[in-house]
Design a protein with these regions (language model features):
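Catalytic core of pol beta-like nucleotidyltransferases
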Residues: 1-25, 34-39, 50-113
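Conserved H-loop
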Residues: 31
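Short beta-strand->loop micro-motif that forms the acidic, two-metal-ion catalytic signature
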Residues: 44-48
């Protein structure tokens, strides 16, 4: 069984391949970022991408396929819950929308290699 760090690194690398030249940030949030997770916790990951909000859905299938590939490779070690967010939209609203504010304050950035 892989550890969470390996899973996150593979996810971040795969995200870079999916988004190509688009600038992305991968951010761990929720119980894993706070350190209060348990055996049933999912791994919450936000992908902040420098894309218009209307294009967020365009990448969903590829991100889900990446998760399936990671699940196949590591035997469903963790349940990954991704969300794709337009970085320009996030930058505009991160002080107003509570979820975005928490993501900015509590999220842990994962290096995208």
């Amino acid at each position: 069984m892989a550890d969470i760090k390996t899973i996150l690194n593979d996810f971040a690398s795969g995200t870079k391949q999916i988004f190509g030249s688009v600038e992305v940030e991968v951010i761990l949030f929720g119980s894993y970022s706070r350190g209060d997770f348990d055996a049933g916790s999912d791994v919450d990951i936000a992908i902040l991408a420098d894309i218009p909000r209307e294009q967020e859905r365009h990448y969903t299938h590829d991100v889900v396929s990446l998760i399936a590939k990671i699940d196949d490779e590591y035997g469903y070690s963790f349940f990954i819950s991704p969300i794709i967010i337009s970085k320009p939209f996030f930058d505009e609203w991160h002080e107003t929308i509570p979820f975005y504010r928490n993501l900015k304050n509590e999220g842990v950035r994962i290096d995208v290699a």
